Amino acid sequence: MMIQLRSEIKTDENLTALFRRQCEAAGLIHDETSPLALVQAAMGEHDWRLELRKLDEPKLGAVFVDFAGGVMAHRRKFGGGRGEAVAKAIGVKGEELPTVIDATAGLGRDAFVLASVGCRVRLVERHPVVRLLLQDGLRRAYDDSEIGESMRRNMQLLTVNHIAELDPARDFADAVYLDPMYPHKQKSALVKKEMRVFQHLVGTDSDADALLEPARKLARKRVVVKRPDYAGFLAQTPPHFSRETKNHRFDIYLPLI
């Protein structure tokens, strides 16, 4: 994939070399003309994070993954916990904490909610840039003194690029979660920023329908598909039941035995 690759680290050649190796392994090629840039941004003297920037729209700011601070820290401390819609849809109830495969992990937000209530979540992300952003966020979360231990236990990024590469006999989970990219109508600042950057990067998941069947083969209890309230069913397949929220719908499918 062609994208601008930038490092803002000026004092540690080992860190810039690490960034280059990560990009090469992900198949990223530097393109000076690309309006999108993956940036290794400095955080103090000895730390860094990866950011995705849309250079022709700098007011959008940078997109990055931060599980230990900001919005995600607030959500972990003051959010609904087990009462969050995604947790209910996955099947969190009482002492029941399903194991989960998040097959469209993205920036890992919903997976983090599930991990924060105690679910063990394995993540799959196929887009190389998004995967690097997620991997970087997990790296820093694993090192965090407050959440590091639970994050290492409950959130794991798998090496596969697609759930079809997983073996239902060995790699199954109680629940498989799907949240494919879909054109958004919402106008909130967060959605507007991230969707404008992300849709420029990956577009919509035009082959998202192909996720449903392998997900139903991997799931032992349910597949949960998050959809905007105005969207049709994934793969034009009616769910067995749905849970509705203000702006979204969780379509729930039973496994294929």
Curated annotation (Swiss-Prot):
Residues the entry annotates as binding S-adenosyl-L-methionine: R109, D110, E125, R126, D179
Tagged with keyword Lyase: no
Alphabetical list of Gene3D superfamilies matching this protein: Vaccinia Virus protein VP39 (3.40.50.150), YhiQ-like domain (3.40.1630.10)
Record localization: Cytoplasm
InterPro entries (alphabetical): 16SrRNA_methylTrfase_J, SAM-dependent_MTases_sf
A GO molecular function held by the record: rRNA (guanine-N2-)-methyltransferase activity
Documented EC number(s): 2.1.1.242
Family (UniProt): Belongs to the methyltransferase superfamily. RsmJ family.
Function: Specifically methylates the guanosine in position 1516 of 16S rRNA.
Protein name in the entry: Ribosomal RNA small subunit methyltransferase J
Lineage: Bacteria, Pseudomonadati, Pseudomonadota, Gammaproteobacteria, Pasteurellales
